[in-house]
């Protein structure tokens, strides 16, 4: 399993999420996943909502174009980003 893969125009990200971090950032590769730190706590879906908001800004896509395929309730997630307009350098290096 790769941390990042392309499916036609879409990106598939396998993520490890670190909630309650000091700042939002893409940390780097963590095993076979991409580690992302977010400031939101893992309570009542706040971390998922914050993650989608952060990714929408990073990839310049509407929030509706980011889909959590697996891991709705855990730290290990599989995310699909539909037709990203921008790919951050750290992720582009993994493609």
Curated annotation (Swiss-Prot):
Belongs to the UPF0235 family. One of its GO terms (cellular component) is cytoplasm. SMART domains: DUF167 (SM01152). This is UPF0235 protein Ssed_1229. InterPro entries: DUF167, YggU-like_sf.
């Amino acid at each position: 399993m790769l941390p990042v893969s392309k499916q036609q125009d879409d990106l598939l990200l396998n993520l490890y999420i670190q909630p309650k971090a000091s700042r939002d950032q893409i940390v780097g590769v963590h095993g076979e996943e991409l580690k992302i730190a977010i400031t939101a706590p893992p309570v009542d879906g706040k971390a998922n909502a914050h993650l989608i908001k952060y990714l929408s800004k990073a990839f310049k896509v509407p929030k509706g174009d980011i889909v959590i395929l697996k891991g709705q309730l855990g730290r290990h997630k599989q995310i699909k980003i539909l037709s990203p307009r921008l790919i951050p350098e750290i992720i582009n290096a993994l493609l």
